[in-house]
Swiss-Prot record:
Keywords: Repeat. It comes from the Eukaryota. Belongs to the PPR family. P subfamily. It comes from Arabidopsis thaliana. One of its GO terms (cellular component) is plastid. Pfam families: PPR, PPR_2. InterPro entries: Pentatricopeptide_rpt, PPR-containing_protein, TPR-like_helical_dom_sf. This is Pentatricopeptide repeat-containing protein At4g21170. PPR repeats lie at residues 152-186, 187-221, 222-247, 252-286, 287-321, 324-358, 360-394, 396-431, 432-466, 467-501, 502-534, 538-572.
Length: 585
């Protein structure tokens, strides 16, 4: 009786649609064949070293030479005690037996790797699962199909760590919440990875809450954990708490670095140098980046005494060689890449004011780009003028584009800056079109029409499209001032870019064109046809066209427009419509 029950249970796993009691004789035969094939493959895997050769003979016994998930799961159960063999067979089956694992098979093979301590292999197997499915599906399926709690905890920790290292802390927190509900604790490595991800995104409060959970779960903090906690405390300005932490015997170069940068940001340079001397006594070295931060803060606060002190230290540590031009260039460019524009600008000015040192052309470009990114527009303008005056050749076009973007970002830009923007654009360096549109709209709102026209003219020949609001304001201005030729040029530009304007702006153009009587009727018809093409018409558009066509005695065209208006359901109010009909008499 027991044997019969086992066979039935096995065959049920292999069956896709029918139960043993209702399946045909041929179905039973197929199930028995699959049972024997699974057992044969398991025996070969467990008993043969060169099992790949022997499996070639079994391949033909599989339906269409394809391994299915139920057969694989049976093999996995029988070979689980030899995890490396099971995992190698999994890879072999995908390559040679057309095996396409379902979520259950994937989860079970990950569990085999995790429970046997093959974490790198488990991580590799997890990656495609995590990359192609949602967090809820991944953790839900793992919870459903894993048989052991320990292996589930290990595998979910790997999932959490994967998300954290990818910078997706939201997904990492979702996995963490799921594990808490299951009363599972992530590994120390997973905790540290998620902490690091939260710190990187400046989520300090959440990070401290996570650390509290880590302590409650009995996870012992390691050096990386303490470094991250010290960094959080320093970012929050809680340097005294960091010193209390250090009094317990916890200290590292990273903790000292965080403290130095914390004091430096607050302008407490005496404390900075005291810490640096303490580090020297303990044979701990600050990095170039940390010295760069201190120098940048000293330059930002204009503390000449400490600027000289930091420079002397950097010379002593061989980070800076004040007389070497090539070294200066590299240092300035490195500081620019770090975003330390006050320090890089100070060294840049020193080099420019000296007679013996000549900077590379690329250094001017780096300086222009860094100042522009930090929204220090006035200083960026000075560097740009210096580049033009000295005839410097900057090959990196992104430097000029970043400068143009900075000029667009400046809400209180002067006329000089607006002229510079036009100059940069004419040289072929076009900023972000969204920002450019905002500048144009701002000029129009402030009624600085000449500046707006200059800006528009500078990009008219380029493949640049302003948004409809900015162009609409300028179009209405052209119509009010009678500059219909410019209005038509702008329309052609928009048409070429397959853009559109607000219907009110188009109506203003139609109205002005029709007021010219017969002179510009054809132009009005062309504009109107484009309006219909882009579905930017309303009742007023048709009214303007019909009245204008009636005035120039184009009665057939007027009637066609009238009929089209009615067909589209754009009939105006009764008073306007009666006035419109009078034009046909």
């Amino acid at each position: 009786m027991v044997l019969i029950h086992t066979s039935v249970g096995f065959f049920k796993r292999f069956s896709t649609s029918a139960t043993p009691s209702t399946s045909s004789a041929s179905d039973w035969k197929t199930q028995q064949t699959l049972f024997r094939v699974a057992t044969e493959i398991s025996s070969i895997l467990l008993q043969r070293r060169n099992w790949i050769t022997h499996l070639q003979y079994v391949k033909s016994k599989l339906p269409r030479s394809t391994l299915t998930s139920p057969v694989f799961l049976q093999i996995l159960r029988e070979t689980r005690k030899c995890p490396k063999t099971t995992l190698d067979f999994f890879d072999f089956a995908k390559t040679h037996l057309r095996f396409e694992p379902d979520l259950k098979s994937h989860c079970r093979v990950i569990e085999v790797a995790a429970e046997s301590g093959l974490l790198e292999r488990a991580e590799m197997l997890l990656r495609p699962l995590v990359e192609t499915n949602s967090v809820s599906l991944v953790v839900g399926e793992m919870h459903r199909w894993f048989e052991g709690e320990v292996s589930l905890s290990v595998s979910l920790s790997l999932v959490l760590e994967y998300y954290a290292l990818k910078g997706s802390h939201h997904n990492g927190l979702e996995v963490f919440g799921f594990m808490r509900r299951l009363r599972l604790s992530p590994s120390q490595s997973a905790y540290n990875s998620l902490l690091g991800s939260l710190v990187k995104e400046n989520q300090f409060r959440v990070a401290l809450c996570l650390y509290s959970a880590m302590v409650r779960n009995g996870i012992v903090s390691d050096e990386l954990t303490w470094d991250l906690i010290a960094q959080i405390l320093c970012e929050q300005g809680r340097s005294k708490s960091v010193f209390k932490l250090m009094e317990t015997g916890v200290e590292s170069c990273k903790i000292y670095t965080n403290l130095v940068e914390c004091y430096s940001r607050n302008g407490e340079f005496d404390a900075v140098f005291s810490l640096i001397h303490e580090m020297d006594d303990k044979k701990l070295e600050l990095s170039f980046c940390s010295y760069g931060c201190v120098l940048d803060d000293a330059c930002r606060l204009g503390d000449a005494e400490f600027i000289d002190k930091v420079l002397c230290l950097m010379v002593e540590k061989k980070f800076v060689t004040l007389g070497d031009s090539a070294v200066n260039d590299k240092i300035i460019e490195r500081l620019c890449d770090m975003g330390k524009t006050f320090a890089s600008e100070m060294l840049f000015r020193k080099a420019c004011n000296g007679e013996t040192v000549r900077l590379w052309d690329s250094t001017y470009g780096c300086m222009l780009k860094a100042l522009s990114r930090k929204k220090r527009t006035k200083e960026a303008v000075d560097v740009y003028r210096m580049i033009c005056r000295k005839g410097i050749t900057v090959l990196d076009e992104s430097c000029y584009i970043e400068f143009a973007n900075a000029l667009c970002r400046d809400d209180n830009s002067s006329e000089e800056e607006e002229e510079l923007l036009v100059d940069v654009i004419k040289r072929g360096f076009v900023p972000c079109t969204h920002k450019l549109s905002e500048v144009l709209a701002s000029m129009c709102r402030k009624r600085r029409w000449k500046s707006a026209e200059k800006l528009l003219d500078s990009v008219m020949e380029m493949e640049v499209y302003f948004d409809s609001f900015a162009c609409g304001l300028l179009m209405e201005r052209y119509c009010r001032s009678g500059k219909l030729e410019k209005a038509l040029v702008l329309h052609e530009k928009i048409k070429k870019m397959k853009g559109s304007l607000d219907v009110n702006a188009y109506n203003a153009v139609l109205d002005r064109l029709m007021m010219r009587q017969k002179e510009m009727v054809e132009e009005a018809v062309v504009v109107f046809e484009y309006m219909k093409e882009i579905n930017s018409v309303n009742s007023k558009s048709f009214t303007i066209m019909i009245q204008g066509l009636c005035r120039v005695k184009e009665m057939k065209k007027a009637m066609r427009s009238h009929d089209e208006m009615l067909r589209l359901g754009l009939k105006p109010d009764l008073v306007t419509y009666k006035r419109l009909i009078l034009g046909f008499k």
